[in-house]
Amino acid sequence: MKEVKEALFMNKGEGESSYAQNSSFTETVTSMTMPVLENAVETLFSKDFHLLQALNAVDLGCAAGPTTFTVISTIKKMMEKKCRELNCQTLELQVYLNDLPGNDFNTLFKGLSSKVVGNNCEEVSCYVVGVPGSFHGRLFPRNSLHLVHSCYSVHWLTQAPKGLTSKEGLALNKGKIYISKTSPPVVREAYLSQFHEDFTMFLNSRSQEVVPNGCMVLILRGRLSSDPSDMESCFTWELLAAAIAELVSQGLIDEDKLDTFNVPSYFPSLEEVKDIVERNGSFTIDHMEGFELDSPQMQENDKWVRGEKFATVARASTEPIISNQFGHEIMDKLYEKFTHIVISDLEAKIPKVTSIILVLSKIVG
């Protein structure tokens, strides 16, 4: 089985279950938060006169969907606006697109050339470079980045939480793949501890790369509740665990594979994120809020259509890490079972999706 950093990516290509075809919700969230990004660019220009020449920005965990196009276009548009306001001749925008090496950079750049870069306008020249690697470590030289953006990536962990087996080697989260109502307290504690460790590494790395007064705009999946086992956090993972358990009962998956698998992801609360940032001490929090949106599948009146669409979207972002544990050959049966479970469960409403947006400025000195 591959390590998390080798198996964590969204479904590739442009097929029915690809991330490129199933990232409309992420695009909606990105578009909603663009005013915050626009304000961040505006603030950068008010802080540093040298930005009138060039701005270095990075989109961390960019995946291969259209969100990156929106981010680059927004930054470029704001720079063009500042160029006109300040009566400068030209500005340059250097954008780095980062994700783990398994990301579908081919699909990303194929769409990028026609949608964003194209012919550089007279006011802003835009240059785009791919940077494969883990954002939990260093990626760039010291004091080289003015702006960091990330959408729906920082909640992914470097590994499954440590300490989820007993001294006797027994699984402590038996039958589940994430925190659930039946998980013992040690599971919740292990997930928070792993997120604390990983997010601290993320902040430490960025604190060296971002210039003084530089800015980060981070959007991540989270929760408004203090309880990490609430359905707003666990809905998809609970139903996937149920689908896997069905295949275990049919003898298609070893029970041990289910009992020893824990998803390397954590949806934190606002308080948990705030505490980690403040403890780290490298950045000030300029803005922070949580907001809820209905799952787009809830717009469908037919529960069968609603369930199938929900399952397809979930497959686009979960299949690579799930297949790494349970095997590629079982994925069609697994997600078919998942779809049936989703449809039967959709007699109840799909929980709203909670996001956290965080704007951080690097502390000077």
Swiss-Prot record:
Which of this chain's residues are annotated to bind theobromine? Answer: 26, 152, 155-156, 221
Q: InterPro entries, per this entry? A: MeTrfase_7 (IPR005299), MeTrfase_capping (IPR042086), SAM-dependent_MTases_sf (IPR029063)
User: Which residues bind Mg(2+) per the record?
Assistant: 173, 259, 261-262
One Pfam annotation reads Methyltransf_7
Keywords noted in UniProt: Magnesium, Metal-binding, Methyltransferase, Transferase
Task: Give the EC class as a word.
Answer: transferase
- Name the site position(s) for Involved in substrate discrimination: 149, 221, 265, 313, 328
Under Enzyme Commission nomenclature, its number is: 2.1.1.159
Keyword Magnesium in record: yes
What Gene3D superfamilies does this protein map onto? Methyltransferase, alpha-helical capping domain, Vaccinia Virus protein VP39
Task: Return the cofactor note field.
Answer: Binds 1 Mg(2+) ion per subunit.
Reaction equation(s) it catalyzes? 7-methylxanthine + S-adenosyl-L-methionine = theobromine + S-adenosyl-L-homocysteine + H(+)
UniProt key word Magnesium: yes
Show the GO MF annotations. Answer: metal ion binding; methyltransferase activity
SUPFAM superfamilies per the UniProt record, alphabetical: S-adenosyl-L-methionine-dependent methyltransferases (SSF53335)
* Swiss-Prot/TrEMBL cofactor(s): Mg(2+)
Binding of S-adenosyl-L-homocysteine, residues: 19, 62, 99-100, 134-135
Q: Please name the GO terms of the biological process aspect recorded for this protein, alphabetically.
A: methylation
Describe the task this protein carries out: No detectable N-methyltransferase activity.
Q: What family is this?
A: Belongs to the methyltransferase superfamily. Type-7 methyltransferase family.
Which named protein is this?
A: Probable 7-methylxanthine methyltransferase PCS2
Q: Which organism is it from?
A: Camellia ptilophylla
